Amino acid sequence: MNLPAANPRSEPRSGSHGDSRLRAIAEAVESSQRVSFEDGLYLDEHADLLFLGQLANTVRERKNGNLAFYNTNVHLNPTNVCVYRCVFCAFRSDLKAERAYTFDEEMIRERVSEATEAGATEIHVVGGLHHQKPFEWYVDVVRVIHDANPRIHIKAWTGVEINWFAHISKKPVEWVLEQLIDAGLGSMPGGGAEIFDEEIRGRICEHKADGQSWLDIHRCAHQLGLRTNATMLYGHLE
């Protein structure tokens, strides 16, 4: 569906509420100038959501016009057994709990087959950190998916999971990522970011990789050519 194009010369400034600096930032965006770090902070502190959305839409339309893009994504969660006990998580399970499960290779292939038949263009893989599984098992999950359908994009393992893999393999993060890329990894999901504030993170997931580790892992992934997402978790302490 084609929507009427926004007027980039008037809409963003309409939400500036007389703020001359916001108007100047909007004019810079409209002129295809890069916003500085300081201007970004000012937007965060002083601009309302609609104003930010209007600026973002100006950039989006410049890049993509009125086209929208999407993929068909299917989740694969190979195990719910997890060594961590994040207070907000309803997914995890203890190893001997009745609800615990772990996929074998046949089950993974079946899931990929279902995704392929449904027209999926991407498999999104996240799961528990199974303390009895070696790093090679997690690599094999990616390898089996890629073998079952070499054309499907594999977005797998969050920064927290990569941190765990480095721990159990006793190898650097870069080496861990290289093994996964060789197996077929195409990008990383943004889970595990949660909230970077140390106090809040310590209360909701104190044993999970800290915010700086998460950022360092994603930075390493970018240096290796992987694209990554980032998520924010809310609905807990606030």
Q: Each predicted region: which residue ranges?
A:
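Generic secondary-structure signature for well-ordered alpha-helical cores
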Residues: E27-R34, E45, T58-G65, F91, ...
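Conserved SAM/AdoMet-binding glycine-rich loop
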Residues: A120-A230, Y234-L237
